[in-house]
Swiss-Prot record:
GO terms for molecular function: 4-alpha-hydroxytetrahydrobiopterin dehydratase activity. The keyword Lyase applies. Belongs to the pterin-4-alpha-carbinolamine dehydratase family. SUPFAM superfamilies: PCD-like (SSF55248). Keywords: Lyase. It catalyses: (4aS,6R)-4a-hydroxy-L-erythro-5,6,7,8-tetrahydrobiopterin = (6R)-L-erythro-6,7-dihydrobiopterin + H2O. One of its GO terms (biological process) is tetrahydrobiopterin biosynthetic process. Its EC number is 4.2.1.96. This is Putative pterin-4-alpha-carbinolamine dehydratase.
Length: 93
């Protein structure tokens, strides 16, 4: 099981990301895409990253907006896995 990050580690890792915010025991970001089909294509690409990482975000799709939430549920909070996947997601947008 991945180790939980403390508040200082979380803030440091958040500083390395753009647009991600902490919401309790998760980090979240909303992506604005040019169209609904491009939003779906983005989610498909996120799914491939998530499968490769063995770590899956919660996904909310609202027309052209996709909100991703990351938390390591089996650890009960935020771990390095969440921030690593967030960084990978940011690379594909």
């Amino acid at each position: 099981m991945a180790a939980l990050l403390n508040d200082a580690e979380i803030e440091e890792r958040l500083g390395d990301l753009t647009g991600w915010t902490r919401q309790g025991n998760e980090i979240r970001k909303t992506f604005q895409l040019p169209s609904f089909p491009s939003a779906i294509a983005f989610v498909v690409n996120v799914a491939f990253l998530a499968e490769a990482a063995g770590h899956h975000p919660d996904i909310d799709i609202r027309w052209r907006k996709v909100t991703l939430s990351l938390s390591t549920h089996d650890a009960g909070g935020l771990t390095g896995k969440d921030f690593d996947l967030a960084a990978q997601i940011d690379e594909i947008i």
